[in-house]
């Protein structure tokens, strides 16, 4: 895997004016943030050696390199999901490449179902912790000592200082913000009402089909992580209506202004 990471990183470096400090993974409907990047260099995933290709609506499938609020960044406009048939190694491959390019911190975003009955569609939630309900882990297999420890600590998977900064900025900008625990499931079927009741009993506030694999690998690699969920719908059983991906896209479209302001301000104040 090391050789493949180096090949991808070498190709991307040819297009990099400077080493990026922050990596951004933009979830369903949230790729609009990449359009805010100044002096952008756009690389389609299919043109990058060893990169998988995104197949989900709302995911553009390209890397965008440049500056955001004066900070050098690299953004994934579209991520890879386990349910698409990719191995966990491929799902998390871009995080390894970001680390090889010099990224210090990862801001990972997603659209998620609200498990907490106090949450409403359109809320933004700072992820304080997660539950891995995917039945697997991206670190299974031989450990590359150069990448990180065999048994990485996950007691502070989400950087407390970055989370506090995000909360403070949201309050300063009058952007309503929630905090909570995100649960990752494999999908692609949405959860049943019984599963959602179970997740709520376990202490989950939101549920989705991504994020946790990337966060585990980022922690393994020694990167700081900030996670933000857009609560795109109430999870199954809370409202008397079926769930759809179209609904997810509609809600993320409505919250994009607040989301953009929040993430740009976080990047601007990153230290």
Swiss-Prot record:
It catalyses: a purine 2'-deoxy-D-ribonucleoside + phosphate = a purine nucleobase + 2-deoxy-alpha-D-ribose 1-phosphate. It comes from the Bacteria. Pathway: Purine metabolism; purine nucleoside salvage. Phosphate binds at residues 28, 59, 79-81, 111, 210. Transmembrane segments: none annotated. Pfam families: PNP_UDP_1. GO terms for molecular function: purine-nucleoside phosphorylase activity. The modification Phosphoserine is found at residue 28. Its EC number is 2.4.2.1. A purine D-ribonucleoside binds at residues 191, 233. InterPro entries: Nucleoside_phosphorylase_d, Nucleoside_phosphorylase_sf, Pur_Nuc_Pase_Ino/Guo-sp, Purine_phosphorylase, Purine_phosphorylase-2_CS. GO terms for biological process: nucleoside metabolic process. Keywords: Glycosyltransferase, Phosphoprotein, Transferase. One of its GO terms (cellular component) is cytoplasm. Homotrimer. PANTHER family: METHYLTHIOADENOSINE/PURINE NUCLEOSIDE PHOSPHORYLASE, PURINE NUCLEOSIDE PHOSPHORYLASE-RELATED. Belongs to the PNP/MTAP phosphorylase family. The purine nucleoside phosphorylases catalyze the phosphorolytic breakdown of the N-glycosidic bond in the beta-(deoxy)ribonucleoside molecules, with the formation of the corresponding free purine bases and pentose-1-phosphate. Cleaves guanosine, inosine, 2'-deoxyguanosine and 2'-deoxyinosine. This is Purine nucleoside phosphorylase 1. It comes from Bacillus subtilis (strain 168).
């Amino acid at each position: 895997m090391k050789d493949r990471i180096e090949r991808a990183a070498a190709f991307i470096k040819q297009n990099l004016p400077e080493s990026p400090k922050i990596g951004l993974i933009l979830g369903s409907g949230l790729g609009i943030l990449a359009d805010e990047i100044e002096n952008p260099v756009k690389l389609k995933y299919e043109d990058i050696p060893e990169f998988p290709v995104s197949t989900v609506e709302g995911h553009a499938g390209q890397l965008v390199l440049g500056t955001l609020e004066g900070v050098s960044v690299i953004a994934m406009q579209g991520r890879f999901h386990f349910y698409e048939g990719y191995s966990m190694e491929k799902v998390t491959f871009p995080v390894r490449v970001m680390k090889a390019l010099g990224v210090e911190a990862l801001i990972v975003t997603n659209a998620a179902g609200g498990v907490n009955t106090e949450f409403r569609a359109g809320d933004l939630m700072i992820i304080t912790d997660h539950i891995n309900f995917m039945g697997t882990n991206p670190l299974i297999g031989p450990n590359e000592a150069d990448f990180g420890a065999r048994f990485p600590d996950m007691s502070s998977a989400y950087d407390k200082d970055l989370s506090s900064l995000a909360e403070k900025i949201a309050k300063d900008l009058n952007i309503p913000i929630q905090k909570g625990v995100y649960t990752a499931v494999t999908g692609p079927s949405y959860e049943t009402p019984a599963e959602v009741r179970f997740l709520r009993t376990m202490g989950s506030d939101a549920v989705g089909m991504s994020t946790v694999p990337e966060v585990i690998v980022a922690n393994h690699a020694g990167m700081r992580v900030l996670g933000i969920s857009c609560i795109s719908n109430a999870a199954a059983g809370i409202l008397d209506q079926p769930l759809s991906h179209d609904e997810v896209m509609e809600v993320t479209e409505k919250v994009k202004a607040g989301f953009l302001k929040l993430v740009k301000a976080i990047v601007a104040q990153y230290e």
